[in-house]
Amino acid sequence: MVQNAVNGALSYQVWDSSNFLLNLRFSDSFLNKTKKYPIYRDLRFAARIDLEALLDELALDDNNQPLRIDSKSLIIESDGALILCRGSLKKEYCSCYFSIWGKSVDDVEKIKKNILTKVDENIIHEPMFSINWHFLTSKNEMESVNIEELANDVLLNEAYPDFNEGLIEFIDSYIRSKEAVLVLQGPPGTGKTRLIRAILGRMSSHKGSNASAVYTGDKKTMESDEIFVRFITGWEDAFVVEDADHMLKPRSEGNDNLHRFLTIADGVIRSQGRKIIFSTNLPNVGDIDDALIRPGRCFARVSVRLLDLTEAMNLVTSLLKGQDATSYIDGLKRSGKKHFSLADIYKAIAV
């Protein structure tokens, strides 16, 4: 019998200690040929709870063997299961994400039910969407964080006066369309991010469950194929690139990254009804590569702009919903400004 020995070295840079510990565990199981956790499920929700208190309760359960990574993450080994618990904090709620490995489907479902029982009265049932935010670490490695977001942004037609149809009608048309690409173009403060959030929230309504999106605003994440591969092979409904000026410029000006989007927009992404949304501060339509916004690939290139005084007064009146808007309107007039950003108006009214 001939035996072959293979020697090698593996370099592993650690950004997330919980992932590192899990990978060690999985490697050990694989090398020892143990079939310990053949079933995997995940559980995610948002709730108005104290995240640390929830993880404390899980860690102190006598049936669990916990390894507390930090205040927002926990690894648990219990009878026949391995659980990675993570959370992130928002102002009024927290997002929770559980990766669960078990011996059987029944075991995993019981664990999910037990976790949900602890937070049942505080789970948020309003429409939400999930952002899978991608970024590069200081070690130049791509990482991502999942964040559950409430789809509760105030979106009024008065904020976008150039739409020929209502905003909801426009968004619904985009979601139902075959075209994958939408470009939102305009100066800072004109409501591009708010509109993107409204689109994702509307996707959730169409699905009957939380929509999800790969999100990045980091130029460096677009310089390799990794984030594109993650989107193509993932389950997210949309790919959102904010501040995408560098991505949209003509290829004749040295833009070497756009071809990846052109390829996926016409391929599997379109056939699956998934979407690609760009926001950009580029001032002119001529600043964007024609191939990206051609009919059949791009649903629309939407220009959003600052509001003039009359439009700003109309928006203030609509935002206040019948309340006395006199003081706010007088403030707009006294400012001496000819144009107003949505950001300034929403901030003044605290929306």
Where do the protein language model's features map onto the residues?
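Short glycine-rich substrate-engagement loop in P-loop NTPases that contacts/grips substrate
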Residues: 163-165, 200, 204-235, 254-255
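Conserved catalytic/switch belt of AAA+ P-loop NTPases
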Residues: 245-279, 283-294
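N-terminal pre-Walker A segment at the start of P-loop NTPase domains
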Residues: 147-173
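Conserved alpha-helical scaffold flanking the Walker A/P-loop in AAA+ ATPase domains
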Residues: 219-247, 258-268
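C-terminal alpha-helical "lid" subdomain
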Residues: 60, 84-87, 291, 297-351
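Walker A/P-loop nucleotide-binding motif
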Residues: 177-196
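Interdomain "pre-motor" coupling segment immediately N-terminal to P-loop NTPase/helicase cores
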Residues: 90-144
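Short Lys/Arg-enriched alpha/beta "domain-start" segment
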Residues: 1-83
